[in-house]
């Protein structure tokens, strides 16, 4: 147990018996009242966001974690089968552990899996940016080049991304896995 004042963003704590990741933590001292820490946390089992006020003197249980590199192999129902890059052991990772970024998991991608001290999976971290191929989009016309609008495009992972008008089928684009937004076209 350590004081909440020694915890920082990204730490994983045990809150009400379940693992939570600290998304943001702000110290507040309102007027002549007692100081507190306003925490926004994400429940790593359910994926729900939780807000909580910790008193400045409160202690929390920080979970000791281990991070390992794994490579995505294939999908088995709602699970993702990953292989340890060092030992070649395979594990099944539930979709909820990856969260909304699961729509950008593609063959061969290397991810970081966060394990707790009891070897259970707390979360999966994808690279911040991934390069995907556009498999389907409406064809570009001369009028499209003059405007700065966007159009929907289907990428190789099966998800839809909003892209600029000049992107064509077969283009490779870089996408932010946190937001799902188009970043840039990749020239190869």
Swiss-Prot record:
GO cellular component: cytoplasm
Top-level taxon of the source organism: Bacteria
Major subcellular site: cytoplasm
Molecular function GO terms recorded: translation elongation factor activity
Coiled coil: none
NCBIfam families per UniProt: efp, PRK00529.1
Protein name as annotated: Elongation factor P
Gene name of the encoded protein: efp
């Amino acid at each position: 147990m350590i004081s909440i004042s020694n915890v920082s963003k990204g730490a994983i704590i045990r809150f009400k018996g379940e693992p939570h990741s600290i998304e943001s933590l702000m110290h507040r001292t309102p007027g002549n009242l007692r100081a507190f820490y306003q925490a926004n946390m994400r429940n790593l089992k359910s994926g729900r966001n939780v807000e909580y006020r910790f008193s400045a003197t409160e202690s929390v249980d920080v979970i000791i974690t281990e991070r390992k590199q794994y490579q995505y192999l294939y999908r088995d129902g709602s699970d993702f089968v990953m292989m340890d890059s060092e030992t070649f052991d395979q594990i099944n990772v539930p979709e909820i552990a990856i969260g909304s970024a699961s729509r950008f998991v593609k063959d061969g991608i290397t991810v970081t899996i966060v394990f707790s001290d009891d070897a259970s999976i707390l979360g999966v971290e994808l690279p911040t940016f991934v390069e995907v191929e556009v498999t389907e989009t409406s064809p570009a016309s001369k009028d499209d080049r003059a405007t700065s609008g966007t159009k929907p495009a289907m990428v190789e992972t099966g998800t839809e991304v909003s892209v600029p008008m000049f992107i064509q089928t077969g283009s490779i684009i870089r996408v932010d896995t946190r937001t799902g937004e188009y970043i840039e076209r990749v020239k190869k």
